[in-house]
């Protein structure tokens, strides 16, 4: 079978910068190829060259047998390209948007209606065909854009980080659609910042500084991992990570949610030493065991070994500075943030409904919820930007309705879309925010020096902000938001679209801030990041449906058990397993499946029998502690069932 996508030694230069350096890859029909790499690695540039939007400096590429440079018209007839920015018309309905794209692609009138209806059914969007696109959630917009891209029946689908900023429920739906496309022999090339998504691809390429460092199946990529991984599960994973790093006994230490991975050449000795260290410090842990490497383990390790880990770690000097700046900023025993029955309506629509919670000083409080659940609305009210319709709230003792200007003086705020000025240099952005916060003279110079040290951008002080990668912009935006040393900081999806290395280092800083007494209020769609919070609240349709520590939510919320299932092609068996008695739901999870079941022993037996009937080898199946993603999805679905009157029966 001929490749549907074929690239040979693709190079793209912008002046003296080589953005893509000799990339060669191929993707066959009915195959998903995942392109992963740090910010600025060249993923988007590669996709743009393959879609004939951008001309390569040298090298060749073909789409469905057509040359991307000399036959761009035929290339565009055979591809669907979905960029990171929505290409939707928000004042048009779902149906009108799809019909408009059908016009653009020249889809014949005969059979068009049936084609659109098929795609709407295919994507579960038919119930919303009359809804205005601007009124859709982020996840539904992603699905609509995909439907628009598929209306002309392309042979190749190019997706540039399609699930960035999308909640886990919507991500699961999106990937179900992608797997259905494989049955139609579509070749899919997807760039992603989610390494668990890359686990689901047939093949993966690791791109860094424009070059492919490795490519192959996920299993082949994992074999690049040198050394064994010892896994420690703990409710205080961040403290465990710090302890293990300070011991200097391990080649690498990384945290994944509530689990710490130690890279070592001597598995037995490493596990025993870790146990001694944990017991000597009195840190809780559930288990210490050998762990098969994940793609994220390999991703981080390969980048470090090749010296291409991108943004360097926060320096100890910049992190320790928080111990001075946060001291004594919140009254002892008083919550830093407190709200009671907080409500916000927009006309007849209630965006936030009688929300109540309090956040002690120095705590990391995570706010989770699907797109459009009300997270950003709550943050805007707490920041004094939006007045509540009802209820009360205080930040540092200041009333959010009566003293919004006082609140703004004492908080830091970092939005989803980094509030930076692209036409200013790095240092000019810092100076601009220093002026907003009334910093001047020696104090401004001290804070500028601190910000440059903290971000690691000293060598890029005069660079235009627009040329920075997302990881660098993230650091600069954070530095600007805390330049005035606020005791409370609000972070609204601060790591959306940022690569795993940058995300991990960003959370190092958040932890250091909290240890210094800074209160951090953060929203996120990365369920792994939710594990790093001291407490969590899940908001859905404007209501808080659960609140507690990550451990409490994982052990007390779910009434059913989780079976972790691994086989060669999980997407081919998931629908069959989902129809078995006693199985409520089956979803893709990393490289395998998670099945939600009432009786794990009985359901497990039926699942084994189903694998035998399908003649598919079952690699392994075991009951596991629910992940935060499992809990998140279960709470959303339970709320939906309750509100639809189906209950639990």
Which residue ranges define each predicted feature?
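ABC-family P-loop ATPase nucleotide-binding domain
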Residues: 1-11, 272, 276, 280-281, ...
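ABC transporter nucleotide-binding domains
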Residues: 3-5, 12-208, 214, 336-540, ...
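Conserved protein kinase catalytic domain
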Residues: 76, 120, 222, 241, ...
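Non-catalytic alpha-helical coupling and interface elements of nucleotide-dependent molecular machines
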Residues: 103-106, 226, 249, 279, ...
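ABC transporter nucleotide-binding domain
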Residues: 176-265, 292, 509-522, 527-598
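Short amphipathic alpha-helices in soluble, non-transmembrane regions
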Residues: 243-245, 273-279, 576-578, 606-611
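Conserved short beta-strand edge segments in small beta-sheet-based binding/regulatory domains
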Residues: 282-292, 616-625
């Amino acid at each position: 079978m001929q490749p549907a996508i074929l690239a040979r030694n693709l190079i793209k230069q912008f002046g003296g910068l080589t953005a893509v350096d000799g990339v060669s890859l191929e993707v066959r029909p009915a195959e998903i190829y995942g392109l992963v790499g740090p910010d600025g690695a060249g993923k988007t540039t590669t996709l743009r060259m393959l879609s004939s939007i951008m001309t390569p400096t040298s090298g060749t590429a073909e789409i469905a047998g057509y040359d991307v440079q000399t036959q761009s018209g035929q290339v565009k007839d055979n591809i669907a390209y979905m960029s990171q920015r929505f290409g939707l018309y928000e004042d048009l309905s779902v149906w009108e948007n799809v019909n408009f794209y059908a016009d653009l692609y020249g889809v014949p009138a005969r059979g068009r209606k049936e084609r659109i209806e098929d795609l709407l059914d295919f994507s579960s969007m038919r119930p919303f065909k009359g809804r205005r696109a601007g009124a859709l959630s982020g996840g539904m917009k992603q699905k609509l854009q995909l439907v628009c891209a598929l209306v002309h029946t392309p042979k190749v689908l190019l997706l540039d980080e399609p699930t960035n900023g999308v909640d886990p429920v919507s991500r699961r739906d999106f990937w179900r659609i992608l797997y259905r496309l494989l049955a139609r022999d579509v070749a899919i090339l997807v760039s992603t910042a989610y390494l668990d998504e890359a686990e689901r691809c047939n093949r993966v390429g690791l791109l860094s500084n424009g070059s492919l460092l490795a490519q192959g199946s996920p299993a082949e990529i994992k074999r690049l991992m040198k050394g064994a991984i010892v896994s420690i599960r703990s409710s205080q994973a961040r403290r465990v990570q710090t302890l293990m790093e300070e011991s200097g006994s391990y080649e690498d230490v990384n945290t994944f949610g509530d689990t710490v991975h130690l890279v070592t050449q001597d598995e037995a000795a490493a596990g025993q030493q870790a146990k001694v260290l944990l017991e000597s410090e009195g840190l809780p842990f559930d288990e210490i065991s050998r762990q098969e490497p994940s793609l994220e383990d390999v991703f981080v390790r390969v980048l470090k070994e090749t010296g291409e880990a991108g943004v360097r770690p926060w320096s100890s000097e910049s992190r320790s500075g928080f111990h001075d700046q946060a001291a004594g900023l919140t009254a002892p025993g008083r919550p830093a943030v407190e709200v009671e029955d907080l409500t916000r309506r927009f006309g007849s629509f209630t965006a936030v409904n009688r929300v109540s919670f309090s956040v002690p000083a120095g705590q990391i409080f995570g706010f989770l919820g699907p797109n459009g659940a009300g997270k950003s609305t709550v943050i805007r009210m707490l920041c004094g930007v939006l007045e509540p319709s009802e209820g009360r709230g205080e930040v540092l003792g200041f009333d959010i309705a009566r003293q919004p200007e006082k609140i703004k003086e004492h908080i830091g705020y970092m939005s989803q879309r980094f509030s930076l000025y692209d036409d200013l240099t790095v240092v000019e952005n810092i100076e601009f925010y220093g002026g907003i916060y009334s910093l001047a003279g020696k104090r401004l110079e001290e804070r500028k020096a601190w910000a440059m040290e903290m971000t690691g951008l000293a060598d890029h002080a005069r660079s235009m902000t627009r040329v920075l990668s997302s990881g660098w912009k993230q650091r600069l935006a954070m530095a600007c938001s805390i330049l005035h040393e606020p005791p409370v900081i609000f972070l609204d999806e601060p790591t959306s679209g940022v690569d795993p290395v940058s995300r991990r280092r960003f959370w190092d800083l958040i932890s250091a801030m909290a240890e210094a007494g800074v209160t951090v209020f953060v929203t996120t769609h990365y369920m792994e990041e939710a594990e790093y919070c001291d407490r969590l609240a899940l908001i859905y349709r404007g209501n808080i449906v659960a609140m507690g520590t990550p451990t409490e939510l994982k052990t007390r919320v779910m009434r059913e058990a989780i079976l972790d299932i691994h086989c060669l092609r999980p997407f081919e068996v998931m629908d069959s397993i989902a129809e078995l008695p006693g199985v409520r739901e089956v979803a893709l999870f990393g490289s395998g499946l998670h099945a939600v079941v009432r009786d794990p022993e009985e359901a497990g037996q039926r699942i084994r029998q189903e694998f035998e009937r399908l003649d598919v080898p079952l690699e392994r199946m075991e009951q596991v502690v629910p992940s935060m993603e499992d809990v998140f999805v279960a709470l959303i679905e339970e709320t939906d069932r309750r509100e639809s009157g189906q209950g639990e029966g």
